[in-house]
Structure formats: C-alpha cells, structure tokens
C-alpha cells in the first residue's frame, strides 16, 4: 500500500462534505432569487450559461449561498458543477455541497476529478440516472491538509481564469473576423 504524503488523511465523503437541506418554496417565499437549472450549467467546464428568476418557478428548489458548490446529481456523467458566485436557488436535481474538512474552493476542484465522477456514476435509475449519496458518502478519499488545499485551489483557480480569458479573446477575434 502506498504511504500518504505528510499531513494527508483518508476520509469518507460524508466526513468532508455535506449536502445542504435548505429549500425554497415559491408558494411561501416571496423573495426573488436567481434560479439555476441543470441546463444553465455547461458540462465539464463549470461555466454558468444563464439562469431564470425564482418568481417564475412553481416547484420547490434548493437554496445555495455564494461560495457553495453545486453538483448535478441527475445524469452525473454530464459532469455539471458550479462554484456559486451569488446567493440563489437551484433545481432539486442539483446538490448544494458544503465543505466540512475541506474548503469549498478545494471541494469545487475535488468533485471534478475522475475518481469522484466514477463513484457518482454508480447511480440509481436506468432512464434518469442519479448519483446515490448513500453509496457515495461511504467511499474514502485522501485529502490534503488545509494549507495545501488552499494552494491547490488557488493554482487551479488561476488556470481557470487564464483559460476563461483565452476563450473570451478567441470569441472576440471570431466576432471581429465575422464583421470584416
């Protein structure tokens, strides 16, 4: 068996993250929030492509806060994840994840790894497969100490920002070329 790096610890998922149970009922709550549905989250990128307003919805939604991690539990093979940049509500098919022994910025990148995706795809349902938290919560992962989580999340965040800026530049050049 391989020895863990210094400071790293093996934890079950249920010990490093939890799923929020806060709900928004449009029939009882009058506050208006941005509402994220699965179709608003781009697969494999963490990019949000729009939202609706909670005043326009009729079903109960999950509540999330800025900095929490959203993960699409329906059809987990689509790899839909988002690090919330605002408070809002989302589809009940999206888990709102909160770090317990991990910081949320690290958690956002943690759920993108192949190992996490693999266990998320051991799902319930044939036609509409969903990630199974009761199964997933018992799986163990090796987790770095807090200071290393911060370094990892910071480095990956800088790479994401660079990629996002590069994509914007390419899109601008494409628009410019079409305009000529």
PLM features per residue range, with description:
Residues 14-25, 31-66, 84-85, 89-90:
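Sequence-specific dsDNA recognition surfaces
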